[in-house]
């Protein structure tokens, strides 16, 4: 019996919608990264993007445990001298709630062109509405 190797043109991708309300950030992000890579499928192939499209709604209602709401700090650099910026989890949720989930998932995906292709299949929205109704996404309970 030969080993099955998925081909990019034969991969079937489904659309799923996930409600992040009350979900723990890290546990949600690991499951999203797993599904974006396609590791939940029998035809998973490491060098082929076999993952599904995932829509995350209510990103502003994601939860963290312990004191991470005030203690977890996100850093970024503007590119200018002395341009290091930071924000706590609470400030990030108020400013850009989508970024919190995106950063968590992006760190769990492979680095390189394949990882970037997987990340493009993640669509995160702060509120309850998304503009992907035409794709008829299935509700995914995580």
From Swiss-Prot:
* Family, as annotated: Belongs to the universal ribosomal protein uL13 family.
Matching entries from Pfam families are given as: Ribosomal_L13
Q: Which residues form a coiled coil?
A: none
Q: What is this protein called?
A: Large ribosomal subunit protein uL13
Q: What does this protein do?
A: This protein is one of the early assembly proteins of the 50S ribosomal subunit, although it is not seen to bind rRNA by itself. It is important during the early stages of 50S assembly.
One example of a Gene Ontology biological process annotation = negative regulation of translation
Any one of the GO CC terms: cytosolic large ribosomal subunit
How this chain assembles, per its entry, is: Part of the 50S ribosomal subunit.
Give any GO molecular function from the UniProt entry: structural constituent of ribosome
Sorted alphabetically, the keyword list is:
Ribonucleoprotein, Ribosomal protein
Query: InterPro entries attached here?
Result: Ribosomal_uL13, Ribosomal_uL13_bac-type, Ribosomal_uL13_CS, Ribosomal_uL13_sf
SUPFAM superfamilies, alphabetized: Ribosomal protein L13
Q: Which organism is it from?
A: Glaesserella parasuis serovar 5 (strain SH0165) (Haemophilus parasuis)
Q: Which CDD domains match?
A: Ribosomal_L13
């Amino acid at each position: 019996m030969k080993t099955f190797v998925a081909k990019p043109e034969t991969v079937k991708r489904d659309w799923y919608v996930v409600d992040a309300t009350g979900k723990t950030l890290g546990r949600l992000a690991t499951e999203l990264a797993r599904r974006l890579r396609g590791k939940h499928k029998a035809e998973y192939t490491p060098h082929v993007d076999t993952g599904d499209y995932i829509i995350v709604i209510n990103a502003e209602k994601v939860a963290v445990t312990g004191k991470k709401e005030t203690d977890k700090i996100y850093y970024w650099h503007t590119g200018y001298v002395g341009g290091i910026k930071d924000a706590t989890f609470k400030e990030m949720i108020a400013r850009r709630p989508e970024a919190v989930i995106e950063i968590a998932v992006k760190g769990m995906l492979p680095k390189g062109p394949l990882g970037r292709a997987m990340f493009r299949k993640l669509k995160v929205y702060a509120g309850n509405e998304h503009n992907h109704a035409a794709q008829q996404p299935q509700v995914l309970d995580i």
